[in-house]
Amino acid sequence: MENRGIYYIDFGTQAQFIEEIEKMNSEYYFKNGKNKTYHIITYGCQMNVHDSEKLAGMLNAMGYVETQNLEEADLIIFNTCAVREHAESRVYGNIGPLKRLKDKKPELIIGVCGCMPQQLEVAQKLAKVFPFLDIIFGTKSLHKFPQLLYKAITTKKTVIDVAEDEDVVVEGIPTARREGVSAFVNIIYGCNNFCSYCIVPYVRGRERSRRPEEIIFEIQQLAANGVKEVTLLGQNVNSYGKDLPDGIPFYKLLEKVNAIEGIERIRFVTSHPKDLSDELIFAMRDLEKVCEHIHLPVQSGSTRILRQMNRHYTKEDYLRLVEKLKENIPDIAITTDIIVGFPGETEEDFEDTLDVVRKVEFDSAYTFIYSKRKGTKAAQMPNQVPDEVKHERFQRLVKLVEEIALKKNQQMLGKVCEILIDGYSKRNNLLEGRTRTNKVVNVKCSDEFMYKFVNVKILEASRHWLYGEVI
């Protein structure tokens, strides 16, 4: 018996729409001697990156071919993020100039999906401000993309689909992962925590876990296709299985993934501190494929502010967790998220945050200035912190975080570590890989090492990356 309100759907229901669009695109190819192309612009977290891989997989199945040139594309999709105002502003700024392209190419399909249009008022605003948009749909309608696209093509009208009540888990969506030997795998969707600053539960829905057998099957298929490293995704992976009848906890899922032949590294994001169990810490310690890295968002070091954020732990709780992690996994790298300028944050509260940063010595931190999100509890709170105070505190925090990150990376100098080379560096003529602790290492070596594990001696260190040579 399934949980009430959560529906398990097979993607096969979209087959007829995929077939119809593929037929249209085949006719286009025979008439014009070229394929129709698509271009996806992605904002936000790893969940969005993986959703874009699913969009690409569906488009490939419908006969489209990806292009890196937006101007040449026959279909453009913006996969959006709603966590911060800055991300939304970038989307509005990037859609506007496409009207010129749409006027030039009337058959061009332009769509907006993801977390922004999952908010009905935002979807309606997008349609009003940009009447040339063809498809607008939220996160809960991702699996219906072929159907929505077919409707937009055949009716020539803007299609809006924002499913507000239905929480679904859809299996079998085709996925076009980037080239390489690392892959993202969803294990749980949505969030039940309702942190007072966060829009995610409203745009991603309530927590709903994939069945363990579906996850294991997907990872087995990935391993059979040469994938060596998987990152298990969820807004809060520590909640995995709690909503399933006879579900297994997250640490048990890790044990199952650890047993899959061919998979050599396991990562996961994100972990909520309140749900980080001893069993999970012990699993990280004992399972040889689970990497020595955890992303554990602290958000604030002030117990008073954490209470206002609805985080359900104190400063002392967080520090005890970190101590336990370091006791059991001495080489663990800990990264985090920190918000500066939450409503009511005093200088004393901010000093508590700096104190946590000094005591934990995070390997890196994503630092954010508080961004008011409509519909969240924090947006209505009094004592909003003035912008100039937020920015001054932000600069102090970033300075401390980067000093510690540099110190931690310099401690790697002269050491030999294993990295999995998985692509080209942004620095010229270098390949790039990551250590088990998720540190980026640039290395000068031939392409024969691409997608392989190699031992590297660390020769240089900066705040954000290391440089080494193959030994």
UniProtKB/Swiss-Prot annotation:
Binds 2 [4Fe-4S] clusters. One cluster is coordinated with 3 cysteines and an exchangeable S-adenosyl-L-methionine. InterPro entries: Elp3/MiaA/NifB-like_rSAM, Methylthiotransferase, Methylthiotransferase_CS, Methylthiotransferase_N, Methylthiotransferase_N_sf, MiaB_methiolase, rSAM, rSAM_horseshoe. It holds the Pfam family TRAM. Keywords: 4Fe-4S, Cytoplasm, Iron, Iron-sulfur, Metal-binding, S-adenosyl-L-methionine, Transferase, tRNA processing. It comes from the Bacteria. The keyword Metal-binding applies. Its cofactor is [4Fe-4S] cluster. SMART domains: Elp3. Residues 410-471 form the TRAM domain. GO terms for cellular component: cytosol. Belongs to the methylthiotransferase family. MiaB subfamily. This is tRNA-2-methylthio-N(6)-dimethylallyladenosine synthase. It comes from Caldicellulosiruptor saccharolyticus (strain ATCC 43494 / DSM 8903 / Tp8T 6331). The gene is miaB.
